Amino acid sequence: MATRFTINQQRAVEETGHNILVAASAGSGKTTVLIERLIQKILSGISVENFLIVTFTNAAAKEMRERLEIAIEKRLRDANDGMKRFLQEQLLLLPAANISTIDAYALRLIENYYHVIGLDPQFRLLSDTAERDMMRQDVLDTVFEAFYDETHPQHENFIALVNNFGNPNQDDALRQAVLKLSDFAEARPDGQQWLKELDKNDLATANGLTQSQTYRLTILPMMIARLEQLLEIAQATQTNLSGVPELKKTQQAFDEIIAYLVNVQQALVDDDWDTLRGKLSQLPKVSLETKRSKGIKDEPELLALLAQATTVKNNILGAKSDLKNVIDTFFKFDQNDWQYVEKQATELVNTLVTLTQACQSAFTTAKRDAQLVDFPDLGALALEILNDDMTRKTVSGQFQEILVDEYQDINQLQETLLTKVSNGHNMYMVGDVKQSIYGFRQAEPTLFARKYRQFALPDNPDSRIELADNFRSQNNVTRVTNLIFTQLMDEKLGDIAYTGEAKLVPKANYPTDVTPVFNMTIIKQPNVTTSEDEDESQEFEKRQAQYAQLANQILSLRDTTIFDRKAEPAGMRPVQYGDIAILTRSKTGYIDLVATLRQAGIPTQVDSVGNYFQTMEVYLMLDVLRVIDNPHQDIPLAAILRSPMFGYSENDLAAVRLADKKHDYWSALTVFAQADQRSQTVIDLIKKWHQLAIQNDLVALIWAIFDDTSWLDYVAGMPGGAQRQANLHALYDYARTYQENTHAGLFRFIRYIEQLQENDGQLGEAPQEANEQAVRIMTIHASKGLEFPIVFLPEFDKSFNTQDLSGKMLIQKNAGIGLEYLQPEALVAMPTLKKLTVQQALKRQSWSEEMRLLYVALTRAEQQIYVVGTVKLDENEENQRLIALWQRAKETSGQFLAEDLRLSAKSYFDWLLISLARTKNDDLESWLGDGHLPHVLGPETTLDSQISVRFINESDVVIPEPQGNETKEITRASTYQAEDFARAKAILDYQYPFQQATRTAAYQSVSEMKRLFEDPDRANLKTLNVLENGQLQPANELVSDKLVLPTFMTDGSQKPSSAAVGTATHLMLQLLDFKQIQTHQSLTALRDDLVTQGRLTAPVAALIDIDQILNFLQTPFAQRLCLHADSLRREATFAMIMPANQIYEHVHDQASVLVHGIIDGYFIDKKTKSITLFDYKTDFVRHGRVEEDISKMMVRYRGQLTLYKQALMQEFPDYTFYEPQLIILNVGRVIPITTK
């Protein structure tokens, strides 16, 4: 059935001839529209070679390519002959099409045009982050050492900079500042120019601080906005007080407050810094009536009015008020003092820029000397290539259209690069600025926002197309999202006004009887005065309570139903664990979360529970490597001895220590080994491994450790053994990749691993197969682009991360750089005025991104959202803070809540509260409100959503027990009865009903069972038959008359068997890289490598028919394998249980038989949820009887492929299976087999 597009979707598919920005909100069918646009252009005769399609992750690029392939194949079925040939050609061109990340495209440009910029074509991409970081650290060491030299011209300035950030013995903070500054510059097309202009601080040079651009553009707008909000609240309070004679004193107080605010407001514009500072400091000292004042104490309405006025007064003039905080920070010093500090800081910035440029230059030189190019180089070098006019015209002429997916995540350098590739009117940009959540990667959402405004102007030739219809979420999810963001997100905070066309429009088709669910659970934590250690314990208990609440809610959902809109036909069904996702801001606490859910019997799937390097099996291997590198390290040596690898007890370790108390532990072990053979064996092993390390063969070293200690086998027997083995194999792979790229030794590898740990690289445990019936746990970042029927959002009360707002140096793309200045004589550190302004800009930027993360989290849900947070309702300070937020939000007029109110939020929970303050929520109003009716919401906000709020005590939350595990009390009879003896006799006389099955193997391989489906070797092997007396012959299924002669009894002249050649051919096909174009030369090289590695013997290798393999690779099926190379699985082992009577014709028992085997290969198409398996055959086919022999092979192997298919169907029950393909290499044919 053809997709029915909306008017705007159709515009997005068809419109052309100019630049187009498609603003595609969550769930609007963006990818479907993009693919349809591409397929329509292809059908019009434009080749895929003429598109440049870029996105921001390899996974997204892969998905785009796969979807386009499916779309072309779909059109191919109904195409006429001419179009069919063209579409088939497009399928062949698709693997090489320009569908990639921007970095990958830049790399392709460099590989093709390296000569334009004089780059050595033999360069290698430095893709390993840890390796790059190590190289940068080495360069920093060299450059810093040069600057520390007293003869260096910048030495004195450098020392002043070092002392400002720390001291010569502790310059880590300065090193990090240099790297951070360099990273910022590398993400800009004008990076070097930007660096040079950083020391232009107009606060230091302006004729008066209030005349500086920084004041006019940053400090003044901030102060004006805050004063306007305070003035509005004060005036509203004064209005409420008018006509109330009992509160005359309070009225007079607010007259003074308003006069003060108006006076300061004017002074901000008119006065110089010192005059303004003086006026700000003259806070009015006012007093109000008290609760016991005459005529008030017995009047509830007057008491409520007085309480409101008191709160407002404290919010304006109180010691902890926002205004008082601004005065104490920004206006701490007079103009002379501030400008002195700014001038000193400017000199430090100048030195910092010089140092950074020196490090950048040295790093570039080091990379070129080593023939390396890193990821930041890619964009810069590609841009340098495109600065050549002739090259730019050549490149630009290749593309009819440039399509940019996820355009909101682009940075300035990437934008400049793509603009140069375009012809000025063929850019097609798709994205949603509301989902720009990659600021830490230098993403620049303002680029999208700028075009969003400009492309909507009537005189602009380019166009903006809005896709606001949401086809994902049930109406209540969409309406709650709109309720929240029409009050929170505007151009100042969020980079787009969430109004009009930017709002979501509910368009998903759900039955009217689907219950709308937006559940907000607030866990009340008792307020207990605690020490710092107890605070940590209380924080842990808070998380545990939330996780337990999640478990309870998830278990309660098992008895409910959801609407499955993707089923055929769509309809209601019970909730499954796979319908549920838990989204978090970070991975902190994942170990506890998973443990809690598993304790409740809830299966989970999580990308990464913890740091890979902290797993026991890997950590121990790293200690072994440290000891091999340097055995005189007591802690690693003691650790490996005490570990299961060597099994020393505490007493053993003590005995070793007593053997030599004066020297290190290795010396003691050496002495102890003279009388202890086990210790001598350990020493011999370490020395053996050390010799391997000297040879710089990391791969052989790690495998030798595995082999000599059986460590791989040991961990397999531990809980989670498969995962532990996967982790160790991953370590082996890290070592192999590192060795291939660097050829460095063990010491550098250990340092490389430590660099990964220091950088908190968050290497997750080695991935296992996905469990589709498990609760998914992931970060909000990882959930982007996904959708789930039910979404849980725990820890909504968790404070925003403010780490980027602190530190000795702050950088913001527009505000520049701000330092903390250390006064050298007094050794007093203070933030400069510039740093304070940068901090404000950074906070606005950070809070904007947090707001967009909240939007992404809410819009992942299809039907139900559960929010969980914890508050200390009994803690007066926190309670008063939340009440103040609620009251201010209630009193806000207009569409959006006040900017400073939104900025004062500390968590998502705060934002959720203030967005509900003007709605009629009795539960929250009874907690935070004062009984006054809420103000009317803005015209863009509607009250058509349903939100349920409930409070529970932390002490009432318990982790549920898994169902079915109840402990039953067992009682024992005190005397034997007659029936006990009858039962005993029945047991003794018991006849096993599956006696026949005991004479068949309960563990069968498919190769042993092939005979049952016409085995090809049946003429050479005896088969198991039922004897004439009906008894089964107790033997293996297939037995040979003769045993193969061992090698030492042969003269070596025996010709390799056809089976050996077939096995060798299978090995080559197993290792073949389907992502690369294969030639006779490359296949021969692969065969020869296998001989060199000892995996094939030369006589066998000589008989492998390379031409047969090449002929197969030319088949259409082989091309499909190339297109699905990423999802290709080869040599896949399986095991399954089958009833014996389904396997053996003469056995009638239903006893279970374990069948195991190895499937040559299969590939998965995740888009269509389909699987195609295949099997290689090297059987001889007679030239004159090809069809006859193929027919026999189809019959012969049908049973075998049936078993393979059944095994995969058990593993992938929800997937469609196409006919298995029998690949007959002898004639280069691929035959589909109809299975039973």
From Swiss-Prot:
Its EC number is 3.1.-.-, 5.6.2.4. ATP binds at residues 24-31. Signal peptide: none annotated. Residues 3-474 form the UvrD-like helicase ATP-binding domain. It holds the Pfam family UvrD_C. It catalyses: Couples ATP hydrolysis with the unwinding of duplex DNA by translocating in the 3'-5' direction; ATP + H2O = ADP + phosphate + H(+). Its cofactor is Mg(2+). Residues 463-785 form the UvrD-like helicase C-terminal domain. The keyword DNA repair applies. Keywords: ATP-binding, DNA damage, DNA repair, DNA-binding, Exonuclease, Helicase, Hydrolase, Isomerase, Nuclease, Nucleotide-binding. GO terms for molecular function: 3'-5' DNA helicase activity; 3'-5' exonuclease activity; ATP binding; ATP hydrolysis activity; double-stranded DNA binding. GO terms for biological process: double-strand break repair via homologous recombination. GO terms for cellular component: cytosol; DNA helicase complex. The heterodimer acts as both an ATP-dependent DNA helicase and an ATP-dependent, dual-direction single-stranded exonuclease. Recognizes the chi site generating a DNA molecule suitable for the initiation of homologous recombination. The AddA nuclease domain is required for chi fragment generation; this subunit has the helicase and 3' -> 5' nuclease activities. Heterodimer of AddA and AddB/RexB. Belongs to the helicase family. AddA subfamily. This is ATP-dependent helicase/nuclease subunit A. It comes from Leuconostoc citreum (strain KM20).
